[in-house]
Structures are given as C-alpha cells and as structure tokens.
Amino acid sequence: MPDAILRLALPSPLRRLFDYRAPAGVRREQLQPGMRLRVPFGRREMIGILVEVTDTSEVPAEKLKPALALLDSTSPLPPALFKLCLWTAQYYQHSLGDTLNWALPVLLRQGELAEARQERFWSIAPGASVDDPRVARAPRQREALTTLAQHPHGVAHQLLSKLMLSKDSLDLLLAKGLVQVEIRRHAPGVRHEHWLAQPELPLNSEQRAAYEAIRAGFDSYHAFLLAGVTGSGKTEVYLQLIRETLEAGKQALVLIPEINLGPQTLARFEQRFNARIALLHSAVNDRERLEAWLAARDGEADIIIGTRSALFTPMKNPGLIIIDEEHDGSYKQQEGLRYHARDLALVRARQENIPIVLGSATPSLESLHNAYTGRYGLLRLNERAGGAKQPRFLRLDVKSRPLDSGISGPMQQAIGQTLANGQQVLVFLNRRGFAPTLLCHDCGWMSECSRCDARMTVHQRYGELRCHHCGNVERTPRQCPKCSKVDLRPVGAGTERAEERLAILFPDYPVLRVDRDSTSRKDAMNQLFATIQKGQPCILVGTQMLAKGHHFPRVTLVSILDADGGLFSGDFRASERMAQLIVQVAGRAGRAEEPGKVIIQTHLADHPLLVQLTEQGYFAFAEQALSERRAAGLPPFAHLALLRAEAHKPGQAEGFLDEACSEAERLLAELNLSGIELLGPVPAPMERRAGRYRAQLLLQATARAPLHRLLASWMLALEQMPSGRAVRWSLDVDPVDLY
C-alpha cells in the first residue's frame, strides 16, 4: 500500500490544501478528518487540520515533508461541525484553513490538548446534615459544611480559599464521612449556580399558540420567525421551549447580539433552570472558553449562550437553536471570515435536523420575506405580556425651535414631568462623545482626522479629539491650528454633552450615561443596570446599547433626540435600520403597569416613513419597504457580493478593481452566465480610512447559483493577479454594510 498522503487545511488566507506525509509512527487507520497536526511551513511551524487522507499528490514524493506530530487521538471537531465549516468556506469563498481555525477556541489553535481538565471537587456527603452532632462544637467545620450545602454541585479544590474553606476542616469532615471528594471535569466557563426562584409564567393565547407550533416541529428541521412586539413575552416562549428541549435530554444554543446582554440573559436562565449553562463571548478568557466549548461538545453543558462566534460551539445532543434579536447587525462578522451568524445558524439547524427560532420585534426584511414566502413559519405576538400597553408616539417638530445641547423646550418639560411623577426617562442619542466636531468660530476650521475622511469627535471629559473610525486620538487644541485664534466651539451634541446638560437642568436626579465609553470598565454595565433597576427616578442617556433587549420597568418616557439621520443615507438599508432602532428604543417605555410615551425630535415630522412607522407600526413600514426593494431589484429580491480593496497610494485600489472587473466580465462570457450586474468600481463612501484609500466593486445578481459559480472561478483568478499584491482586498458575500 502506498504511503498515506495527508491533505491539510492551514490557517492562512490561501484557499488551497497542503500535502504532507504522515508523522513517523502514525498509521493510516489512526487518522480522521478534523484532527490537528503540527507541520513545518517554510521557516516556521503551523497547526493544520486534516481534511482527507489520499494516496496521490501533485507534489513529487521526494518534496513532500512529513508532519511533525499528530495532536489528537480523535477529532476535536464533531462531524456535523466539520461539515458546517466546509459549507461555510465554500459559500463565503474563504480559506478552509482559516474557517476551521475560526471554529476552534484559541488554545486549540495553539496546540493545547482537546481534553477537559480534571479537578478535585468537594461536596456534602449524601444524607449528611449541618446539624450533625459531630460538628456541634466545631464551628469552623460546621461553617464549612454549611458552605458546601449551599453548593450542591460541589466546590472545585482551587476555589476553596475564595469561599474561605479551610483544607484542614474539610479533611476532618472527610474523616467523619460528612463530605466527599470526587475527581471530575473542571469547566470554569460553565455555570452550576441556580437560584430556581422564578416559576414558569402562564402563557397568553398568542404565546401558547407560538409555543405549540414550534413544539410540534421539534422532531426535525423547522425554521420559525417569532415576530413579537417589544415586551410581548418572546423570552418566556424561549424559556419554555428550552425546558422542553432539556427534558428530552438535548442541548439548546441561544445566540444574543451583544456581550452586554449576556449577564441578564444568564441571570434569567439561572433563575429558571437547574441546568449547566455555558456563556461564550469575547470577554470570556481563553481557558474558560476552551473548557465551556469542550463541555458543550461532550454533553456536559445543557444550555449554551453566546454572541456571534458561539455558533461554532459543538453540541453532543443538539436539540434547539434560538437567535434572539435576529435583525441585529452584530450577527454579521465584518473582518476575516465575513459570515452571518443568523444565516449560518439556519444552515446548521438544517444539517443537524433540529428546529431553529428567529426572534425579533423588528424582523429583518430578509427574514420577513422568507416568512411571507413560506420558508419560515411566521408566529406573531401582537400584545404585550401582562396587559402592558403599547407606548404612544409623538413626533415633535423642532424646525425653528432653539435646541439646548440638542434638547428642545417641550422635551425638557416632558422629562421634568416624568421625573416629578417618580418615573424614569430614557434619552436616546446614537452619537458617542461630547460633540461630533470642533469648529473655529473665526476661520471655520473643523477638527478632521489626519488618517480618514471624517471629523474628529470631541470627548471633553478626557480633553481629547477621537476618530470613531480609526481610533486616532489627539489632545484638544487650545487655539485654532489654522488661524491661532482661541474661539473653538463644539458643534452638535453627543451623549456626553446631553449627560452634562441634563445634569444641570435636573440637578435633583441621577443622570446615567450608557455607551461604549462609559461601560468600558469591567462590570460597569452591571453596576449601571443595578442602579436603574432600583426604580428610583433617574435619566438614562445612551446610544443603541440601550435599545437591545434590556428591561427597564420604571421607564415611561423615551426621548429620541435626533431621528433624521437614517432618512438621508446612500445605503439602501438605512431606513430599515432607522425603523428598527426607533421601534426597539421605543420598546423600553411602559413595559410594566405604567403606560409609556415616546417623543421623537425631528425636522421632518411629516416624512412618510416616520408617519407610517409611528402611526401604523413596524410591519406596515416593512411591507412598504419590501415593495420598494422588489421594484428596485435589491435584497431580499437580489443577491450581492462586494469586492473591497484598499491601498496606501491613491489609485492603486481602483486599478486592482478595474482589472478584477475586466476578469469578471471575461468569466461571465466564458461561463455563459446571465442576470449578474457589475456596479463600479467606485470609491468607498469614506474613501480614506486609517491612512488607506478604499474602493469597491459590487456584484448584483437575480439568482444565487450563477453568482456563486462566478465567484468560485473569479476568486481563483484574483489570487493570481499581480496587482492584488499591492493592495489589501477582500470579498464580502451577502454584505450588510456597503461602506
């Protein structure tokens, strides 16, 4: 039998496989797809993933290098997840090695063993009691026994000191048979603390109908769009579906759009389930992430909660996938492997033959279209749970009105009245910082980023100008860099300025700012929300972070300071995003017994989009928007791919894209493909960013199959273009942002 040739995927942008001989002493029957091997690559070593074992290679036998070591006895990637990675790499036209690498926790990419760590766990012995007479006169032993009784799943040995548990006391208790020690998996990323304080809530008729419809499809793949107004009780439906999943001995994967939603989601699940819960997001350290990932793979975690990348978490017994706030743009990865977690979750659910639920009060137009055409089951929740009323909308025309740090007189009055009534106010402004720019009142100079076609934002608290696009930071000048005068004025308002002004206008009430700057410290978000949940009158000032799934029962007024930005954008998705944001922010008002009110400041109070959204609701807007998309031949009635390029010198990116466009036209003719339009190349909407000049070429197709046939051949050609070596380029399939 000829020597086995190993075809490996390496973590590189090269969209090809690499051939190696098996490591010394490794037999063919030991090998299986998904295993990791350490291999030589040029002057360094890399960790590759085995894709297949074959007998032939295009590389001459004498030039084939042996792999250095086999790192696994079995594949760390289950077959279903390996299959998903193969599909992902092909669909998004991405390197398979990079895709497989993306699916692995960082420590596995670095060669760590794919095995759970074992740890000694101390727990109270069966039948033992803290009232045992043998500890009546031993207070430290009694205290240790009481602590262990509060941790029914046991305490890891390394956590003894954290809980003030004495090893000597435990040894004495062990000798008395009152405690026990066992060796088992230690997974710090999996939570075992459960309060079980919250019983199931009764479902109303709409919730019950949705629950029963999804439950009826539990035996196989079914996709459901749970479209419920804010506060309609979607989460309660999720929880009862998960309970059904756990009772069947299966696991549930729940994706959330933001890290900041993790703690409150985890708390709700811990209150409800006596289950092992893994939390996976970018703030979890590498060790915790690996242990949680392995626990899910081995069936030792029942519920997996995470952000976008948690989609690649393996499950031994998959039973249900839930995508909360499915419309959220955070589910689209914007760098490297540019996948959409919602779309890939649908593929994974189909491959694993399990149900998937997409939930949102403001579904994406793509998901609504799929529901209207029968690809998803559409389940509507039109009433708020518990009898809460929908908020009332008021469009406040601010034309010709004076604005005090962006706040009109009528808005100030409404805020003051709400606070006087003992309630809370949410002030929404989707701009961080103190002001969008700094202006010289003498010569007209404005603070512009030296590396981007963008203005620097004033962050007054730190005395800095910051670019929110490239991260460039400069000290705020004392005098104009152009004319040397000192009359420099912040122009416009951001959350920092609104916070400062509101604190002056309402000195008797706390003003809490919630944005990326104010929540950058660890636990800052939890501390802010703990203050809000006390229910005392206060003002919340924040960006879209406040719009995502948070529950503020004492907020009865939502003040939207500027609703006009989304009405004048070149991005065809801007109006959809604006509508979703307004409805989501508005949904924070009146979620308990108090009715809510939403006041929208606008210079365009009669704009058809705002009128329709506030008077007829999101679904009326969505149906109108879908009609316009159909007429314009835009997604979801078309399929897009965007080729981006950037370079240090002007013209280089366009030069590469011109050549790429010519190659695409040649391939269209050669492959006899139709229904594909090439738009561009054109400069990017922000042409210069982080010191690079950017341009893009858009491909628009009426059908997906011919577009992907073109992309497969086109990418091979692009990788060979000499002009591509002078630029940084990437392909984005199904782009969400056309920036």
Language model: regions and residue ranges:
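Inter-lobe coupling/hinge segments of SF2-like helicase ATPases
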Residues: 198-204, 208-212, 220-654, 658, ...
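A short, contiguous, amphipathic alpha-helix enriched in charged residues
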Residues: 5, 17, 32-33, 651-666
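A general secondary-structure junction signal
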Residues: 52-54, 104, 183-185, 429-431, ...
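Short beta-strand elements
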Residues: 512, 668-684, 725-733
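Generic non-transmembrane alpha-helical segments
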Residues: 659-671, 710-721
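Accessory, non-ATPase domains that flank or precede helicase/AAA+ motor cores in DNA-metabolism machines
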Residues: 1-360, 367, 372-388, 420, ...
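Small-residue-enriched segments and motifs
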Residues: 3-8, 20, 48, 393, ...
